[in-house]
A protein has these predicted regions:
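A polyampholytic, Gly/Pro-enriched intrinsically disordered region
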Residues: 1, 34-44, 105-112
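Glycine-rich phosphate-binding P-loop
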Residues: 1-10
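Conserved active-site beta-strand-loop modules that form the wall/rim of enzyme catalytic pockets
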Residues: 3, 55-57, 83
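Conserved nucleotide-sensing/catalytic segment adjacent to the nucleotide-binding pocket
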Residues: 9-79
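Hydrophobic alpha-helical scaffolding
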Residues: 34-38, 84, 139
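Short hydrophobic-aromatic micro-motifs
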Residues: 59, 86-87
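Conserved NTP phosphate-binding and transfer environment spanning the P-loop NTPase/kinase superfamily
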Residues: 78-82, 88-199
Length: 199
């Protein structure tokens, strides 16, 4: 959401890896989307790179693998050496966004449900067997999403963040506002770099 808003504010700044892959880069990332193969992913990225970028390149922090597609070395190396920004939001807001995104249509429900047993095995098959599916089937979607965030996704994210240094933290609970703040921060950062290079 934030990446799309930044693109609206500064056309051409963003590289949407998830959009090009048709996958949100998680175990549930294909729900409601059409994942592509590596060849299509590479072709889409090559087309986007040929279009060029009129300013800095803004990319959502991803793992090397987005769905079944691998981020090319050149892009991955640039990501690893890039300035890192961290976005945080309250739990209730994140739950609202995820429910709206993943359960936007009835067609999304069955593919999502089909992945829950796998997550149960990762959380602990004895304690969690059938629990997530039951939450889903009984309409306790908010509770389900909170469990997934608290016990599955957030720990994975925290592990992947080890060793990363963030230049700035932002409150992402208002997409329009945080996109404006990020654009302003980037433009100020670039302006300072230019001034320093001229000294």
């Amino acid at each position: 959401l934030v990446l799309r808003e930044i693109e609206r504010l500064r056309c051409g700044w963003t590289l949407d890896l998830e959009g090009h892959a048709g996958h949100r880069s998680s175990i549930l990332g294909m729900v409601g989307l059409q994942p592509c193969n590596q060849k299509t992913f590479d072709s889409r990225l090559a087309t986007r790179m040929r279009e060029g970028f009129p300013g800095p390149v803004v990319i959502e922090g991803e793992s090397r693998k987005v769905g079944d597609s691998i981020v090319p070395d050149s892009i991955w190396d640039s990501m690893c050496g890039a300035v890192q920004l961290r976005l945080d939001a309250p739990m209730d807001y994140r739950v609202d966004v995820l429910i709206a995104d993943y359960l936007a249509t009835e067609e999304n429900r069955e593919p999502l449900r089909a992945q829950l047993p796998f997550i149960e095995t990762r959380l602990g098959p004895k304690k969690w067997h059938g629990v997530l599916v039951e939450l889903f089937d009984s309409g306790q979607e908010r509770e389900l999403v909170k469990v997934l965030l608290d016990l599955y996704y957030d720990p994975l994210y925290q592990h992947s963040e080890k060793g990363r240094e963030h230049s700035q933290h932002f409150d992402a609970s208002d997409v329009s506002r945080v996109a404006l703040e990020i654009v302003a921060w980037i433009e100020k950062h670039l302006s300072n770099e230019l001034q320093n290079s001229l000294l």
